[in-house]
Amino acid sequence: MYNPFSIEGKKILVTGASSGIGMTTAIECSKMGAKLVITGRNQDRLSKTLSLMEGDGHIMIVADLSNDGDINRLVDECPVLDGLVNNAGLNQIITTQFITREKLATIMDVNTTAPILLFQRLIKKKKLIKGGSVVFSSSISGNFCVGLGNVMYSTSKAAVTGFVKNAALDMASRGIRVNAVAPGMIETHILDNSKIGVEELDADKQRYPMKRYGRPEEVAYGIIYLLSDASSFTTGSSLVIDGGFTLQ
């Protein structure tokens, strides 16, 4: 059956695959017949992701992408890829007056530096095919809107969006596309562990035109579109997935 949105048989590396959007993206890609390389820092949670994936031939590699040695090992152990989903991320609620060099370095390293270096080393080692697709997880925060306490997170994600545009230009002659997804608030287990109460979360959802947060699979579907040949003329873009929040 003709399906330009198919990713069947594509080899795709997903980082941050042990939870949240990364986990869901890996599972959804496997349902569509892709062959996954999944990575994350927590072996037990990564193993759970692997157990929920469909099909066979998937590879699990435990790695801490804030460590250059782990990045190099991951690249060496990866097969030649059709796609990369740079999804690993970190947030810390803090306002400007409480920023420290150490706190800023930590969040920038995880959200910005590590995914950039992973991409760069995959390119250098010729581990991405011509016609390949790279998707970075960015955010509406910092790019389209801001929020109290998001100063470091917004900065790191705005930097990712800037990198995506420049890298797309650099890679165009090689036939490699570079895009980003920019989600609004998404229902993940991170919210289960937050200090924000249910009533506060319900009130916050009312700020969204659709009166709810997004689901991880709704972001995964956007990522799959950008990985597929249906987006073959799309590069340097940020796909906003926010239930209309930034329209207000």
Where are these regions (language model features)?
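Active-site helix of classical SDR
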Residues: 119, 156, 164
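Substrate-binding pocket helix/loop in short-chain dehydrogenase/reductase
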Residues: 95-96, 103-105, 204
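Short, small/polar-rich loop/turn modules that mediate ligand/substrate recognition or access, typified
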Residues: 172, 177, 234-236
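Alpha-helical segment proximal to the catalytic Tyr-Lys
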Residues: 124, 169-170, 232
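Residue(s) in the substrate-gating loop at a strand-loop-helix junction
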Residues: 139
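Short C-terminal tail/terminal secondary-structure segment
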Residues: 2-3, 224, 235-248
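Conserved glycine-rich cofactor-binding loop
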Residues: 18-20
